[in-house]
Curated annotation (Swiss-Prot):
Belongs to the CBF/MAK21 family. This is Nucleolar complex protein 1. It is found in: Nucleus, Nucleolus. Disruption phenotype: Larval lethal between first and second instar with reduced larval size. Conditional RNAi-mediated knock-down in proliferating cells of the eye and antenna imaginal discs is viable but results in small eye size and disorganized ommatidia, possibly due to excessive apoptosis. Conditional RNAi-mediated knock-down in cells of the prothoracic gland impedes pupation, probably due to reduced ecdysone hormone levels. Conditional RNAi-mediated knock-down in fat body cells delays larval development, induces dyslipidemia, and is lethal between late third instar and pupal stages.
Length: 1174
């Protein structure tokens, strides 16, 4: 049987023809490519196929004239388009015409049909209604057909498959072969081909029910697999607590039986183990390396590696999280770093911010709902159970982490406590999980013995309360437990109260009411103990001031926060307690008057009396600022004009004797009050309404002449009324006066009712000692204090007083208590540039900004930049001082230059006239004054100063004696050398002569601060001399301390034994003090003083002391020499040399030993050149 050749062409890809040759038995033979078998002949008896040939079948079914393709399967050049085979009615191949793309000429191409004998059989053409080409290519032309072969090489099934995509509007047809080898035409629906396990094809009909079910199952499995993959991708992108937001479904906790809890726990655990493989697939590519780094390397690297693992895949790395928590123990040196890393991990990855973590046994309601939900697949339910198990394990791990943090807080060092406090505060502010445990930890740290730790806990607790105002009630309840513990310390109570006062403004009314009750309870406890002058009382009053604004009174208190007994106690504190406590109490009373509309008379009377307290001049700037704020606010809200004028008068009186900064503050307060309340200006400015309330009725008409003309009309009515009721009953007159007089609670100036003449207090004149400001009569007094303040010694006070008198505006916006205080004034002489605030510091709250206050304007500029134009009145003193120093420096420089000119002129013979002319111009010809200037300005000006030197380059520190420190160091060096030289000398006379203890001649500034004793005077009886200056008593070492057995320790020692006893019992003193004491009582110091002193006045002052020395040494042999002064015990020169050699050979010998210094271990202090008595 002739072989049939079929050609399959693949479109849409590279042009490649595949050739299949069938032998006589009908089997297909695969020919090798020519390129793979180059040894075969090129044509091998057949012609080269240049163009695919059509197969023609005869009547016997055999193909005629079939030419084979190229054996090497090489792509022919003309094989770009496949050729179709056309058969006639008799089954023979008909000569085919050229293929028309539009299919308009000739019938459509036919498909090849094979019979049972594997021979091609005639096939009818396609029906036009079934398949329309519309001038396009057929489906099987667009997509080539593949023929699959079984193991025996026979072609069994042909299915349409292609590696390339066809056009979307075309669909290829599948060919189905039956048992007879014929293909059944079915153009409406493509046929399915199913393959067995051995690869053989099996015919499947569409009507087979089993195949439809299997198809549905396979489709559903593929869909479920695809959906699961999508779900996994979505879960990996979300945080774990956002994957199933429906659970927990309710806040209700359903009680479960023990069996149900165990069943649910096992179910969740098994589900988690089943899903663990899926969870592990989410690990990053370097997960294995991170696992290695978690157990090897430094502590910080291990912590970071574990954090990366947990961050990338929390559900698959619970073991890594457990390992990290183990690193947080206090025994680990790097626990602080691990705690910080884990805190970030809990905050950013693991903890849900809006709910608590749930354990498995609390999932009863969710489990019940999940079992009833039929929309979820079993796989989804299993995953939900796995998440429940993970959350339960995470809750346990978090509790273990907090245990380690608590251990660091309780038993750790300071750095451990700091890191633990920061971690606990961050977690408490972020999530509600374990908030009670975290809050207890932080509140307990308020009682830490280290003040820094307690302050840090207070700060972080305040931040938590500000972020979560709703937590204030819980925080206050926990702080209350701390305050009322039995073993609580005063420091812990102070920090707890400071914390409560910081959160009081942000609390709600019920929280403020609770704070008020706590403070009042603690207030009673402290009053009973008598501890009212401490910091705790101040903290209580400060907390009450802030909390009482929003507090609500109790239902059974008649609308009052304070009981009568409590009010009396508080007012007693104003008069009896310390000035700081009294000021805090006044602030509390002002809050009650301003906010709760309490009776104001008693408060104003207490404040008015407190302004006379002499302790106000010694208070700090903080207390003074608080007091001025209270006074300003009290006067501002007071509607009683006469009372307000009395307070203004009292403030002016305080200004006269107060320090400059408090005086300036009082004047600023008065200035603001007078500008806001114009009726307070002048001696009388009371309004008619207020005067009627404060008016006092005088029954005696003779006293009415004391009133001024301004109030004549008002008091004429009083006069008429008094005349009408002159002869009336005194009791009735008293009743009328009660109605018209002031209702002040402290105004009790009434005579007895039986007295005929009833007279009230005369308020027509000013009474500075009146206890009630409303009746002090300040409206009738002139404010002559302002005239005195114009002559105040502080220039700023003068300016402020002048501006108040002229009713002009005071343009000052700084803090007078800081700018005009003594510390600021002295700091300006230090010539330091002011500190510059950073941007972060400038943006802080008002409390911190007040502590870092810097002066504004000219007061905040460097001293060198001051000019006469921008200098303020209080800085003018410094400016003039510097200008004076500059002028002196210029005079010294000019004088030095002129000296050189004078010297040159003297050499030329013009000596006299030039010198006289210079002296007349410079007006400085005193050599002593020049030496004084040289010594004052230091060595810089001794050598001369360049006249053209810029003023900005002047070193003011050197001008003020900056070389003193260098001179002192040189003096010390000289003294050490002299001490060493003295040790090597054998004779006292040589010792005196060879000693070079010359001091610097320019040390005059240092000498000004020294007493007479330090400049060379010998004071043998410093305590008995009543005429000594106070500075002598303050100098170190000026008082010699005697032993306990001495009757008079101030007397000078009369013998070496007494001196030794005194020195032995005296406490150890510094080198300077020992040196001073030696210089005062030792004869050697007198010799040094004689040699180094340049001030002869000090020598005359010590003449009496020197004469007493001569009298004491009158009986000594060899008198008239210096040895008689230094050798009072009459020791020989041999004895002195032996003692000196003995001391020099001892181990503890460090040079020349003077009086008061120990000679050796356990020995008594020895005097140089003195013999011990045996």
């Amino acid at each position: 049987m002739p072989a049939a050749v079929a050609t399959g062409v693949q479109f849409g890809g590279p042009p490649k023809n595949k050739k299949i040759v069938f032998d006589d038995s009908g089997e297909a033979v695969v020919k090798q490519n020519k390129k793979e078998h180059p040894q075969r002949p090129k044509f091998e008896g057949k012609e080269q196929v240049k163009k695919p040939q059509k197969i023609k079948f005869g009547e016997d079914g055999k193909a005629k004239g079939a030419k084979s393709f190229n054996k090497n399967h090489q792509k022919p050049d003309f094989a770009n388009k496949p050729q179709r085979i056309k058969f006639g009615d008799d089954g023979e191949q008909v000569a085919s015409k050229s293929f028309n793309q539009n299919h308009k000429n000739g019938p459509k191409p036919q498909k090849i049909k094979f019979g049972e004998d594997r021979e091609a059989v005639h096939q009818k053409p396609f029906n036009k209604n079934n398949h329309k080409h519309n001038g396009q290519k057929s489906d099987f032309a667009n997509k080539p057909q593949k023929i699959k072969f079984t193991d025996d090489g026979e072609d069994e099934v042909t299915a349409n498959s292609s590696n390339t995509k066809t056009e979307p509007t075309k669909k290829s047809q599948k060919i189905k072969f039956g048992d007879d080898g014929e293909s059944k035409e079915n153009f409406k629906k493509p046929q399915r081909i199913k393959f067995d396990e051995d690869g053989a094809g099996k015919n499947v009909s569409d009507s087979d029910g089993d195949s439809d079910e299997e198809l549905g199952d396979s489709i559903s499995k593929k869909h479920n697999k695809y959906q699961s993959k999508i779900d996994e991708d979505e879960e990996s992108q979300k945080k774990w607590y956002h994957v199933h937001p429906d659970y927990p479904s309710t806040d209700e906790v359903l009680d479960m039986k023990e069996n149900d809890q165990l069943e649910l726990y096992n179910l969740c655990k098994n589900s988690f183990e089943a899903e663990k493989i899926t969870f592990n697939k989410r690990n990053p590519s370097d997960a294995r390396w991170l696992q290695t780094a978690l157990h090897k390397g430094t502590a910080k690297d291990r912590a970071n590696a574990g954090a990366l693992l947990v961050t990338s895949n929390p559900l698959g790395n619970l073991e890594a999280l457990s390992t990290l928590i183990g690193f947080c123990k206090i025994s680990n040196k790097a626990s602080n770093d691990v705690i910080a890393v884990l805190t970030d991990l809990w905050q950013e990855v693991l903890l849900p911010p809006n709910r608590k973590l749930l354990a498995v046994h609390t999932r009863g309601a969710d489990w019940k709902k999940l079992k009833k939900d039929e929309n979820l697949r079993n796989e989804q339910k299993r995953r939900i159970y796995a998440y429940w198990h993970f959350e339960s394990e995470l809750k346990d791990q978090y509790h273990e982490f907090l245990k380690n943090v608590m251990q660091g807080l309780q038993t750790g060092q300071e750095h451990n406590k700091n890191s633990s406090i920061v971690s606990a505060a961050r977690l408490l502010a972020y999530a509600p999980e374990k908030e009670q445990l975290l809050l207890t930890m932080l509140v307990n740290k308020l009682g830490d013995p280290i003040a820094k730790i307690a302050s840090k806990a207070l700060h972080h607790l305040s931040e938590v309360a500000q972020k979560h105002p709703n937590m204030c009630g819980v925080i206050v309840a926990e702080a209350e437990k701390l305050l009322f513990r039995n073993n609580i310390s005063e420091r812990a109570q102070h920090f707890a109260l400071c914390f409560l006062s910081s959160i009081a403004p942000s609390g709600r009314p019920e929280v403020c009411t609770k704070l008020v009750n706590i403070c009042f309870a603690l207030f009673k406890v402290l009053v009973q103990k008598g501890a009212v002058n401490n910091r705790t009382m101040q903290a209580i009053l400060r907390c009450l001031q802030k909390a009482i604004v929003e507090a609500k009174p109790a239902k059974d208190s008649n609308g009052e926060l304070l009981t009568k007994e409590m009010q009396d106690t508080i007012y007693r504190l104003v008069h009896l307690a310390d000035i700081r406590v009294a000021v805090q109490t006044l602030g509390l009373l002002l809050q009650l008057v301003a906010v709760k509309t309490e009776k104001s008379d008693r408060f104003y009377n207490a404040l008015y009396v407190k302004l006379l307290d002499l302790n106000l001049i010694n208070v700090g700037s903080k207390t003074a600022a608080h007091l001025l704020h209270i006074v300003h606010r009290a006067i501002h809200i007071d509607n009683h004009v006469a009372r307000a004028q009395a307070f203004v008068k009292r403030l002016l009186q305080l200004t006269l004797y107060a320090p400059p900064h408090i005086a300036a503050g009082c004047l600023i307060v008065i200035h603001k009050l007078l500008r806001m309340r114009r009726e307070l200006i002048g001696g009388t400015g009371a309004s008619e309404e207020v005067e009627e309330g404060s008016k006092v009725v005088l029954p005696i008409s003779a006293d009415l002449d004391k009133f001024g003309s301004d109030d004549e009309e008002v008091y004429e009515d009083v006069k008429d009324e008094a005349d009408d009721t002159k002869d009336s009953n005194p009791l009735e007159e008293k009743a009328d006066n009660d109605v018209k007089s002031s209702a002040s609670s402290w105004h009790h100036a009434r005579v007895a009712a039986t007295e005929a003449k009833v007279r009230d207090i005369d308020s027509c004149k000013y009474d500075p000692y009146h206890r009630v400001p409303a009746f002090a009569g300040a409206a009738y007094a002139l404010r002559h204090e302002l005239l005195l303040l114009r002559q105040h010694y502080h220039p700023t006070v003068q300016v402020f007083a002048e501006q108040i008198l002229q009713q002009s505006r005071i343009d000052y916006y700084g803090d007078p208590l800081r700018d005009f205080g003594l510390p600021h004034f002295l700091e300006r002489f230090a010539f330091k540039n002011p500190k510059k605030l950073e941007a972060s510091q400038a943006a802080e709250n008002a409390t911190v900004a007040h502590k870092r206050y810097m002066a504004h304007g000219a007061r905040g500029r460097p001293v060198k930049s001051l000019t006469k134009a921008n200098c303020t009145e209080d800085e003018m003193f410094i400016f003039n001082f510097l200008e004076h120093k500059r002028r002196q420096a210029e005079i010294v420089a000019q004088n030095k230059k002129q000296k050189e000119i004078k010297k040159d002129a003297a050499e030329e013979g013009d000596d006299g006239e030039a010198g006289e002319e210079y002296l007349k111009e410079g007006e400085v010809d005193d050599d002593e004054f020049e030496a004084y200037l040289d010594g004052y300005f230091g060595k810089k000006f001794k050598e001369g100063v360049d006249e053209e030197q810029d003023e900005e380059e002047l070193n003011f520190l050197q001008e003020l004696g900056g070389e003193i420190k260098k001179d002192k160091s040189k003096d010390k060096k000289k003294k050490k050398q002299s001490d060493k030289a003295e040790d090597e000398m054998d004779d006292i006379d040589d010792d005196w002569g060879d000693d070079d203890l010359a001091e610097d001649e320019d040390d005059e500034i240092e000498g000004e601060d020294q007493s007479d004793d330090e400049t060379g005077s010998i004071d043998l009886q410093p305590l008995d001399d009543d005429d000594d200056d106070d500075d002598d008593d303050d100098d170190e070492g000026s008082i010699s301390e005697g032993g306990p057995g001495d009757s008079d320790s101030s007397d000078a020692p009369e013998s070496p034994d007494e001196e030794d006893d005194d020195d032995e019992d005296a406490p150890p003193r510094s080198k300077k003090s020992r040196k001073d004491s030696t210089d005062m009582v030792g004869g050697r110091s007198f010799a040094k003083t004689l040699k180094q002193s340049h001030d002869m006045s000090s020598l005359f002052a010590a003449a009496d002391d020197f004469s007493s020395l001569l009298e004491e040494t009158a009986k000594v042999k060899g008198q008239g020499t210096s040895n008689a002064v230094f050798n009072k015990d009459k020791s020989s020169d041999k004895q002195l040399k032996w003692e000196e050699n003995r001391r020099s050979n001892s181990k503890s010998y460090k040079g020349k030993k003077f009086a008061g210094k120990p000679a050796a271990k356990g020995g008594r202090p020895q005097k140089a050149g003195k013999k011990r008595k045996h």
